[in-house]
Regions:
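Non-ligating segments of multi-cofactor redox enzymes
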Residues: 1-31, 82-284, 292-293, 299-302, ...
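Short, structured interface segments
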Residues: 57-76, 303-318
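Accessory beta->alpha helical hairpin/"wing" motif in late/C-terminal subdomains of nucleic-acid enzymes
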Residues: 48-49, 288-290
Length: 360
C-alpha cells in the first residue's frame, strides 16, 4: 500500500458539536448526518454529535446545514491566489506542484465551490476516472456543475472544470504554471500567503449582512448561532456579485409554508437564526419568515404544537437575491368565549383560546 493511500484512509473530519442544532434544543430531531454516513460512525448522544471513525467521504458535510463537519475547505481558502485553484484526491502525488491534495472531493458542496470560484477565478477538480472507478465512494463531480446551474449560478459552473485524465491534468499544470511546478517555488508562495486565513475571509464577508438584519429584526437579541454561518447568507452574497442571473428561476431551496397557526410564538422564540417573526398590531397578527436568514435546520417544524409548518418548493433566485419578510399566515383578533381573553388563530370556526381548548 502506498503512502498516499494511508494518508487518504486517515481522512480525519473536524467536528464542531457546538454548532449542531441538537445541542441548541432537545426538541430538535435533525439526524441527516447520521442517516447519510456510510459507516454508521456518527453518533448524537445527549445533544452532542461525535464521530467514532471516518473514511473521509464528506457526505456529512454535504448533509449538515450548520457546518458542524469540516475537512479541507478552510485549507482551500488559504491557497495562493496567483492562479486557478486545483484540487485533487490525496491518493495522487502532486507534492511538487501547487495543487491542494484533499480527502474525497465530494466533500466540497456546490456552495463552497462557488465561493472558491469567486475567490480564485477558476477551480479545477482532478477526478481521475481510474482512481474514482476503484474507489468505494460513489461520486458524480459533474453534478456540482449541474447544481450551480440550478441555483442560477451558470457563470460559476463555467469556471468549475472537471479533469478526468492524467495526461490532460499534466498538460493543464504545465500550461498554467510553467516554472511554478517545483517544490521550492510552491513553498515560497505558500508562506507568502499564510496570513490569508479562511476564517477572516468568510466572517468579514458576512458581518455586514448580519448587522443589517439585526437592526431590522429584534435588535435587542443577539444572534444565537454566531458560532457558524447561514449558508443562505453566502448564497445571497454570491447572487449580488453574479454577472448574470434570472430572478424568476426556481431554485432547489426549501420554502417554509404554514397550514394553520395559533400564533403561540414558540417558533419565533426558539429560531436560532431569528428567521421567524410574529407581529401583532391593530387587531391582526402576522406570521412571517425570512428566506435568507433561515438555515433550514427544521427546528421550527419540530417545536410547532400545531404541526402547521412544512417545507415546500417554489423559491426563486429573487427570493434570495432581494430578500424580504414573506407572510406565512394572518389572523384577526377574537375573544375566547370561555375566558374572554384575546387570541389569534387561522382556524375560522375556532371560538376558544388554546388554553381553554386544552383545559375544557
Amino acid at each position: 500500500m502506498q503512502l498516499s493511500d494511508l494518508i487518504a484512509m486517515a481522512a480525519p473530519v473536524d467536528v464542531h458539536p457546538e454548532r449542531c442544532i441538537r445541542a441548541f434544543s432537545p426538541r430538535a430531531t435533525c439526524s441527516k448526518c447520521v442517516q447519510l454516513c456510510p459507516n454508521g460512525s456518527i453518533r448524537i448522544d445527549g445533544g452532542v454529535v461525535s464521530v467514532d471513525t471516518c473514511d473521509g467521504c464528506g457526505r456529512c458535510i454535504q448533509a449538515c446545514p450548520h457546518d458542524v463537519f469540516e475537512m479541507d475547505f478552510p485549507a482551500a481558502l488559504k491557497m495562493p491566489q496567483d492562479g486557478p485553484l486545483i484540487i485533487c484526491c490525496r491518493r495522487h502525488d502532486f507534492s511538487d506542484m501547487p495543487v491542494l491534495a484533499a480527502n474525497c472531493l465530494q466533500q466540497f458542496t456546490w456552495l463552497e465551490l462557488a465561493i472558491l470560484v469567486e475567490r480564485f477565478g477558476e477551480v479545477v477538480l482532478f477526478a481521475d476516472q481510474t482512481t474514482c472507478a476503484d474507489c468505494d465512494f460513489d461520486w458524480f463531480p459533474e453534478g456540482q456543475q449541474m447544481l450551480l446551474e440550478r441555483y442560477g449560478l451558470a457563470a460559476y459552473a463555467e469556471k468549475l472544470r472537471v479533469i478526468r485524465e492524467s495526461d490532460e491534468m499534466e498538460a493543464y499544470l504545465q500550461a498554467h504554471f510553467g516554472d511554478l511546478n517545483t517544490r521550492r517555488v510552491y513553498m515560497k508562495n505558500q508562506l507568502g500567503h499564510v496570513r490569508q486565513a479562511a476564517e477572516k475571509y468568510t466572517r468579514q464577508s458576512l458581518s455586514g449582512y448580519l448587522d443589517a438584519f439585526r437592526e431590522t429584526v429584534h435588535p435587542e437579541r443577539a444572534l444565537v448561532f454566531e458560532k457558524t454561518q447561514s449558508q443562505t447568507l453566502l448564497l445571497h452574497e454570491l447572487y449580488e456579485s453574479a454577472p448574470e442571473r434570472d430572478p424568476a428561476q426556481e431554485i432547489p431551496l426549501q420554502a417554509l409554508t404554514n397550514t394553520h397557526c395559533r400564533f403561540c410564538r414558540s417558533c419565533e422564540k426558539l429560531c436560532p437564526w431569528q428567521a421567524i417573526a410574529i407581529v401583532e398590531e391593530e387587531g391582526r397578527a402576522v406570521l412571517a419568515h425570512h428566506d435568507v436568514l433561515c438555515a433550514r435546520c427544521g427546528l421550527c417544524l419540530d417545536i410547532c404544537p400545531e404541526h402547521g409548518l412544512h417545507w415546500d418548493r417554489g423559491l426563486t433566485v429573487e427570493n434570495i437575491a432581494a430578500p424580504h419578510w414573506r407572510v406565512l399566515a394572518e389572523a384577526t383578533a377574537r375573544e375566547c368565549e370561555r375566558c374572554g381573553e384575546i387570541f389569534y388563530t387561522t382556524e375560522e370556526e375556532q371560538t376558544r383560546c388554546a388554553v381553554c381548548r386544552n383545559k375544557y
